Amino acid sequence: MDSDDDGDRRRDKFARERRDDDSYRRSGGGGGGYSRYDNKRPAGRREDYQVKRSRGDEGDDGFDPVRGDRNGNGAEPSSENSIYSGPLLPFKRFLTNQEDDISEEDAIKKYNEYKNEHRKFQLDRFFRAHKDEEWFRLKYKPEEAKKVKEVQLENVQKRLQIFNELKEQGQFDKFTLDFEDAEAILRMLDSVVVKLENGSEDDLKAVLAQKLDDESLADVKKENKDAAEKVEDQVKDEVKEEPNEEQEEGAIDDETDKASNKVNIHKTCSVFLRNIPPGLTYEELESTCKKYPGFLRLALTDGIAERRFYRRGWATFKRDVNIKEICWGLNAHRLRETDLNAIINRDITRRVRTNNGVAAHKQVALNDLKLAVKLTALYDKKLGLFNAADESESDREKDIRMGVDLVAASTNPLVKEIKSIVPKDTLNDISEEEAELLGVSNGGDSQSDKVRYERDDTILKALDLLIIYLRIVHSIDFYNHGHYAQEDSMPNRCGLIHVRGQPPSGASINTDENGDLIVPQKFINDFISGFNSRIDKGLIEKQYVSEEDMEKMGKKDGEKEVEAFIAINTVELAKDKWLCPLSGKKFKGPEFIRKHLQSKHEDKLEEARAEADFFNNYLADAQRPVDLEPKHMPHMSRDDHRGGGGDRGYGRERDDDRGPGGGRSSFGNGSYDRRPPFPPRHSLGGRGGGGRMFDDAPRRQPVSYRDLDAPDDIP
């Protein structure tokens, strides 16, 4: 009978083909030492798997081969391209494929060339893999991206109309953007939502007469005792008038269904869809959601790289539907053999949130006013509002890129009004040299000085108008330095806003003999600097890709692509006998095939041109999505696997992939599925010395200095 060791050896013969999840989930323990897995598994060649490519036969270089596009239309790469198909090689790994006597200068030059070619190859492969996915087409395909921008412009123009209506009615004069006015701010947000939902004046009156249920109001009560007493008195009066007020949280007290519909017009129910495959289209999802009563709209995100470019979505329904039944129905319905993983989306319970109260200080407010004016002029220009309406998109983009003074050129009536409200030259920027000469480069005071906390109502009034304009028209939450780009498709079409909080407090902030707050100048300067930085990075700055970089990344020429398409469809069969594979017809010469394609298949030639523009749009995006790069594991020696000294043992490596709470991160290493990624397999011997990664990968022979005339018994 065979021994256990013999049986183990026979099983180990096929260890490389087996993927036993349970075996590698068991850690080797401690800071190193062998685990059972380490003893059983021979050396492997592959590093952590790249998420979006399926596992297949391993290439000679130890990296995944190209699988073509997602639909299987791409061909396997040729052998000379195999070095580009995997992750970028480190410099040391790259040198193993070079000559031994290569100079340092040549090595660096060749490595830079390799990096450029690798980048070009990876971008082209990513484009081919995702070009048929809806999110990618909407983002970069010229005709589809144009439609998206047209819809966006329509939404912004409607929001602009609503802003002007509310402004003419004096709605913005009833409050300031301070947290103590949270109730009036909530009423303003509700008014915007009712108008966005095409509600009537009766609907608006019913909504404004409704009792507000928001945690922001409770916070106001806690922060201001006097205001809290007034609110409590109002609540008591309302209780006397409405005896049926005691209801569950979120419930609405109305006498009839008709009144309920009016009150609920600004509220919705929604379902969050966590798992939308990249190939699933908006129309497919929308048709599924329309099967349920009360469906309003659907919002989908772009593909998420960390989740294999799966998307997330929100399906919005009317408030009076049974959202639980709808959620159950969506979970029971599979689309393309995929579960949507729908859950009920929670309502926003705190719609008014606070920024640091120092934002009301005159110096800070003046800085914010300049930023708000710039943002207003910039986003008006981007979307083609006011004087930019007659300009082409390329001309508008050129002006922005060249740094044209958009504030001075703006014809937005609100910008003109702001200029008339604030003192002259308030909005003018000064140069760095002028600031240094005037002694205002650091805020005008020494960093160690303290200044009196001062509010300027004129500046704050102008600032509030601009912030409300940005929030309603452009969906920009100024004090949160965020842009809610998809807000018109989301469940809450004007959901929340950040405002100024209570005046600052802390150990470094005190009061003078008059009871006025005294704030350190350094605190103010640091706050301004940090806020400006976040606004610039989040809302103003845009990275551009130069023409030179686009050429390096493989920019395509539309006419050259057409010529290449014609060449592919021109096949010589014999003398004076040519075939057009596209139509299957035969011609006497290539010039006849060209004429045939230009007359009968002009649409195909246009597709070739459009494909080039499609690809170039992808390259022109500095924030373009790409595949996540797998991590390279360091070469490990034999001693690293043994306990007692190595801090990079196998058990430690797995710990490095864990999330901040100690457990494995849900999407660690860029993996969408919840299984841990396949661990690297290390050699425990052989090849003279410590184990190395990629034992089967080609490598240059070590240089030897052996005397060929020496006897065989002398090494």
Swiss-Prot record:
Residues 243-256 have a biased composition (Acidic residues). It is found in: Nucleus. GO terms for cellular component: nuclear body; nucleoplasm. GO terms for biological process: primary miRNA processing. Keywords: Nucleus, RNA-mediated gene silencing. Residues 1-87, 223-259, 629-715 are annotated as: Disordered. Disulfide bonds: none annotated. Residues 7-25, 37-57, 223-242, 629-659 have a biased composition (Basic and acidic residues). Coiled coil: none annotated. InterPro entries: Nucleotide-bd_a/b_plait_sf (IPR012677), SE/Ars2 (IPR039727), SERRATE/Ars2_C (IPR007042), SERRATE/Ars2_N (IPR021933). Acts as a mediator between the cap-binding complex (CBC) and the primary microRNAs (miRNAs) processing machinery. Contributes to the stability and delivery of capped primary miRNA transcripts to the primary miRNA processing complex, thereby playing a role in RNA-mediated gene silencing (RNAi) by miRNAs. Belongs to the ARS2 family. This is Serrate RNA effector molecule homolog. It comes from Caenorhabditis briggsae.
